[in-house]
Regions:
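Short glycine-rich hinge loops at helix-strand junctions in the catalytic core
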Residues: 48, 81, 140
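Short glycine/proline- and charge-enriched loop/turn segments
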Residues: 55-58, 108-115, 254-258
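Accessory recognition modules or surfaces
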Residues: 2-13, 26-28, 56, 60-72
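Conserved FAD-binding catalytic core of PHBH/FMO-like flavoproteins
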Residues: 97, 103, 130-292
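Active-site-adjacent segment of FAD-dependent monooxygenases/related oxidoreductases
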Residues: 62-134, 150, 230, 384-386, ...
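Conserved mid-domain beta->alpha element of the FAD-binding
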Residues: 9, 14-24, 30-57, 173-174, ...
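Short, flexible helix/strand-to-coil boundary loops that buttress conserved ligand/catalytic motifs
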Residues: 64, 80-81, 90, 110, ...
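C-terminal helical "tail/cap" subdomain of flavin- and related membrane-associated enzymes
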Residues: 2-10, 26, 106, 285, ...
Length: 446
């Protein structure tokens, strides 16, 4: 499927994210490593715009974590020619098993709903590299590393770099994450900071060879399935990636670091062991395999919904405007939907003077949906982390009866899946644009 070309090719700047250094390991400061920004560069590049991506890092680094590529995201990558690169490295899930925290008792097995397409999982670096490779293969997309943005102008658009350079353009896209510099300038409010949710996550990646020695662990990495263990104030999600050569494990738990500013910290192996003391023996086996120096802990943060995502010829996308908790696996997907919507509206204009108006259509197309998805993640956290007791017993009974499609875990619930996975961000943006143009024509005839 050929991507439609823009009526007016624009000069677009995409501002990426900063890195925090942890010894010899570099970890991006937010959950998704520049996926939204690179997706914006790709879709705009395919439509004929000239795109410069500015990354603050001197070199893009691999981030050791997995990601779920949900159908609403994969649908867009299909159109943009990235799917073959993704499928060369992914695992297509067939089932998700939900187990009790202490004894591993199976609470329910849900087949993956393929009504809206495949649900695949992949190493974040493999996904990021697939998008980068596809984008940078275009002659009109370039990536400039070691380019830290310190200021932005809104109309006409430009960015100032730490080295004193000023780059002028038609549009600036702020894809610089939950600690966004562009957002602070856009809102003229530096008080909108990430707020700790009280949760944190360990993310570990285990190589196949160390799991093959135990038959139970070998089965986990061999099968095209995700496993979720749920318990009081905690849960774990795990699945194979990189064609079953790595096993991704995310362990969510109460944050013990208080108001510490760092988004990512080196974690303690002993603290991880203590956090999951008394959990299923399979969980403890997985934790035992983790190298003492490979424990990284992510603080899960949000900020309150913004009054606006746009100003002049500047727009925010992804975690810069709607950071997501990982409980419905939509953080990267919503950033990619933002990118898709921008690609549509910026390619529909007939003159540069329409850019601010196009961005207002982008916001109308995206803001309510993204913030609704954001809220659904927060709600799912409560369900998954119930303490043992009457509510937990009732929830577990629902898992057993979930063959009907109604599921207490929103990720596996059919109605929630239809809302999340059935959405076509490009169609929604085009519909919003066409409705807007129809209203403009109607008003002109009054």
């Amino acid at each position: 499927m050929e991507v439609p070309k823009a009526n007016v090719p624009l000069e677009v700047i995409v501002v990426g994210k900063k890195l925090h250094w942890l010894g010899k390991r570099a970890v991006l400061t937010i959950i998704e490593p520049g996926i939204g920004g690179m997706a914006a560069a790709l879709t705009l590049g395919l439509r004929g715009h000239h795109v410069i991506v500015l990354e603050a890092a001197p070199k893009l680094m691999e981030v050791g974590a997995g990601i779920q590529v949900s159908p609403n995201m994969l649908r867009l990558f299909d159109r943009w020619g990235v799917s073959d690169l993704i499928h060369a490295q992914d695992v297509a899930l067939e089932h998700i098993h939900v187990r009790r925290w202490d004894n591993g008792k199976l609470l329910g097995t849900m087949p993956v709903n393929k009504t809206f397409g495949q649900q695949v999982v992949i190493h974040r670096a493999d996904l990021h590299n697939a998008i980068i490779d596809r984008a940078l293969a275009l002659p009109n997309v370039e990536l400039r590393e070691d380019s830290t943005v310190t200021d932005v102008q809104f109309y006409p658009a430009s960015v100032s770099l730490a080295n004193g350079q000023i780059i002028r353009c038609d549009v600036v896209i702020g894809a610089d994450g939950i600690k966004s510099t562009i957002r602070d300038h856009l809102l003229e409010d530096s008080t909108i900071k990430a707020v700790a949710t009280g949760d944190a996550a360990y993310r570990i990646m285990l190589p196949r060879h160390i799991m093959e020695e135990d038959p139970a662990l070998k089965k986990l990495i061999d099968e095209p399935q995700a496993t979720r263990w749920i318990g009081p104030s905690r849960h774990i999600i795990a699945y194979p990636v990189r064609k079953h050569e790595l096993y991704n494990v995310v362990l969510l738990h109460p944050d013990s670091h208080g108001v510490e500013e760092s988004w990512t910290t080196k974690g303690s192996k002993q603290a991880m062991v203590d956090n999951y003391d008394g959990w299923d023996s399979t969980v403890r086996k997985l934790i035992d395999l983790v190298d003492d120096n490979e424990v990284l802990e992510w603080k899960l943060c949000l900020h309150r919904p913004l009054k606006t995502w746009i100003r002049g010829s500047v727009a925010l996308i992804g975690d810069a405007c709607h950071p997501m908790l990982p409980y419905v696996a939509q953080g990267a997907a919503q950033a990619v939907e933002d990118a898709a919507a921008l690609g549509v509206v910026l390619s529909a204009i007939s003159s540069r003077e329409e850019i601010p108006h196009a961005l207002s259509v982008y916001e109308r197309s995206r803001k309510k949906r993204a913030e609704t998805v954001q809220q659904s993640g927060s709600e799912n956290r409560v369900t998954l982390h119930l303490p043992d007791g009457p509510e937990q017993i009732a929830r577990d009974a629902q898992f057993k009866a979930s063959a009907s499609g109604n599921n207490p875990d929103k990720w596996s619930d059919r109605r929630t899946q239809e809302f999340l996975w059935g959405w076509d961000a490009e169609k929604a943006a085009l519909d919003t644009w066409n409705e807007d143009q129809g209203q403009i024509r109607a008003n002109a005839n009054l």
